[in-house]
Amino acid sequence: MTTLTLNTSLLSSRRILAAFSGGLDSTVLLHQLVLWRERHPDVTLRAIHIHHGLSPHADSWVRHCETVCERWQVPLVVERVTLADNGLGIEAHAREARYRAFAQTLLPGEVLATAQHLDDQCETFLLALKRGSGPAGLSAMGERSPFAGTLLLRPLLRETRKTLEQWAVRHGLCWIEDESNQDDAYDRNFLRLRALPLLQQRWPHFPAAVARSATLCAEQERLLDELLASDLTDCITAEGTLRLSPLMSMSDVRRAAILRRWLAMRNAPMPSRDALERIWQEVALARDDASPCLRFGDHEIRRYQSQLWWIKSVAGQHETTVAWPVWQTPLALPAGLGTVQLVPGGELRRPREEESVSIRFKAPGVLHIVGRNGGRKLKKIWQEQGIPPWRRDTTPLLFYGETLIAAAGVFVTREGAAEDKEGVSLVWHA
């Protein structure tokens, strides 16, 4: 029986989606998973190929992958992605698009298997070192990682590229060669083509030693997670915001570790030391009457009520009006704010036949809301209800004609209150 080189202890799941580029590494991975399936007939195996459109050979690569999967009786999903310039660089953007496609393709109960190996681990470590990363970044890749509500497995992570080549030759496998892999303008290619061969010539076991260092860094991070668990419980609210008061008495090092872990929990990119310092100085310690904001790509960190918030950047909609001619059907909101709909059963009256329905994001004058005596301006209501400033001109306001009826999830006006049991509710799916 052929001895598999992949780490079969990872393969407890019986439903596997294999990332399959058609290159050497993923071909060996898929071949070994096919052999694994032969030994375990209850295993369901699929493959996914990402068509980036970056190479003139991309279509022929799809045909190659289809041929291989047909021969091995593996259902293949081909996903075409479009790469736009978002400032990340082509490598990072291609990876982001690739993993987004993986997440969208995974079925319930399915795990993702990718073909990274020991040499890839070494490259990842050195790239993190070049960026000045700490232990978290230097932990590189784990054999098992959370991903899209399931797991990402790297069963070949302990094997060298040479081992995979030997397997492929011994079993007569065919694979494609991506011409971009020979372009040392890319950092990872530079390491693989130029730097690592020199290092391995001097120290043959260099990749294995680097992998051990990555493992030690990962262990240190897990230890820190354990030691800081009670701090995180004290600092993080049920809404996922970060309380500032417990951080004030912490050492700089401890506070930075808490900030990093909070951002990781919000799926934010790992911040540099300079970024952490800016978060603390420019946002956390800003004047009490300020509304500080620090942008990170398409997200931002803000302070409100002595808490830090990690939020998606959304342009204010202060001047926007969205007509809702058929209020019985859901309405799409601008700027990625989601949808609203009026559903039967609730405390809002239905619109009268002569009343037009619209969604707006500002309301002038003095307002009277249900459950409160006296009138207030909208700004005062937002403050009383604890609505953060950045949500005040992105929260949908329901109007019948020129009359404000309700703010989604916040309040109902007296003019909008239902007088019978035929009321409706304004539901906002953000």
Swiss-Prot record:
Stored SMART domains: TilS_C
Regions crossing the membrane: none
Binding site residues for ATP: 21-26
InterPro entries with a match to the protein in the record: Lysidine-tRNA-synth_C, Rossmann-like_a/b/a_fold, TilS/TtcA_N, tRNA_Ile_lys_synt, tRNA_Ile_lys_synt_N, tRNA_Ile_lys_synt_subst-bd
Protein task: Ligates lysine onto the cytidine present at position 34 of the AUA codon-specific tRNA(Ile) that contains the anticodon CAU, in an ATP-dependent manner. Cytidine is converted to lysidine, thus changing the amino acid specificity of the tRNA from methionine to isoleucine.
Family: Belongs to the tRNA(Ile)-lysidine synthase family.
UniProt-listed Pfam families: ATP_bind_3, TilS, TilS_C
EC supergroup of this enzyme: ligase
NCBIfam families with a match to the protein in the record: lysidine_TilS_C (TIGR02433), lysidine_TilS_N (TIGR02432), PRK10660.1 (NF007942)
Keywords: ATP-binding, Cytoplasm, Ligase, Nucleotide-binding, tRNA processing
Protein known as: tRNA(Ile)-lysidine synthase
The keyword Cytoplasm belongs to this UniProt entry's keyword annotation: yes
Organism, as annotated: Salmonella typhimurium (strain LT2 / SGSC1412 / ATCC 700720)
Lineage: Bacteria, Pseudomonadati, Pseudomonadota, Gammaproteobacteria, Enterobacterales
GO MF annotations in UniProt: ATP binding; tRNA(Ile)-lysidine synthase activity
Catalytically driven reaction(s): cytidine(34) in tRNA(Ile2) + L-lysine + ATP = lysidine(34) in tRNA(Ile2) + AMP + diphosphate + H(+)
Subcellular location as annotated: Cytoplasm
Domain comment as written in the entry: The N-terminal region contains the highly conserved SGGXDS motif, predicted to be a P-loop motif involved in ATP binding.
GO annotation, cellular component aspect: cytoplasm
GO biological process, one term: tRNA modification
Enzyme Commission code: 6.3.4.19
Main location: cytoplasm
